[in-house]
Amino acid sequence: MEPYLSNELFPPPTEAWLQTVSSDPEAQGWGAWGRTEKTSLVPRAGSRAGSDKEAEENEDASFLLSLLEPENLAKSPVFNQELEAIKLKLWAMEHAEAQPEPPCVQRKATEEERAEVRQLLSPETVDCFFSRTSKENVEADHRSVFVGNVDYGGSAAELEAYFSPCGEIHRVTILCDKFSGHPKGYAYIEFASHRSVKAAVGLDESTFRGRVIKVLPKRTNFPGISSTDRGGLRTHSGNRAAFLHGSLHRKARLRAHGRSRGHGGAPQWFSPY
């Protein structure tokens, strides 16, 4: 049985429909989706704008990547400016370390240092410092006593307990040899008041740890001034006297020998030295 074809049921395709089908793959059915898309003869405005944007983005990306290449980096003006700035900073730092300060700056610094030294070594500052120190030392010495013939095994705590009835004690000092560290056998006791010194002197010739101790008020030692007759003057005078004594005896020997030669006999007097 042959199929029955009727133009009324299936009219022939028109030219407009053919153009639409050829440009739109969806209108061709599902079989047309698997085939490669045919380019339209009439380009659309939207597709052209999209392709232009993609082209611009590709150009920008390729330009940025080209800037990162070493050859293009060396040719870049921004890179050259930054490199020159870094080189200039390094050069300035090296020259600042190697080159000395200008003479005016050095002269100003030396003048300031000299002014500070003059101020520190000025008589007013030195006198004020030494006067304050000497006054404090003199005041402490007036409140202290010297304790001699102290037993070597005695401690500062034992001395403090022994002299505590005399008054409040600020400090007990037992002098020791700086080389061996052994005590020298005497000590200094500093009291809080002058009255305690008088009471402590009353313990003179008393017995401490089986030994008779000597208690005296402490002397005040001034720098450069000796409180005894011993000193450089005595040594100088002694040397001078020895020199005079030796010169007199030398002259006496010369005279004795001269007379013996002149008279041809023994001298009238003899010096054994």
From Swiss-Prot:
Q: Which UniProt keywords apply?
A: Cytoplasm, RNA-binding
Residues covered by the RRM domain: 143-220
User: Which GO molecular function entries does the Swiss-Prot or TrEMBL record give?
Assistant: poly(A) binding; RNA binding
The answer to whether keyword RNA-binding applies is yes
Any idea where this protein resides?
Cytoplasm
InterPro entries with a match to the protein in the record: Nucleotide-bd_a/b_plait_sf, RBD_domain_sf, RRM_dom
Query: Which PROSITE patterns does the entry link to?
Result: RRM
Superkingdom of the source species: Eukaryota
In terms of Pfam families, this protein maps to: RRM_1 (PF00076)
Q: List the protein's name.
A: Embryonic polyadenylate-binding protein 2
Question: Which species does the entry assign this protein to?
Answer: Mus musculus
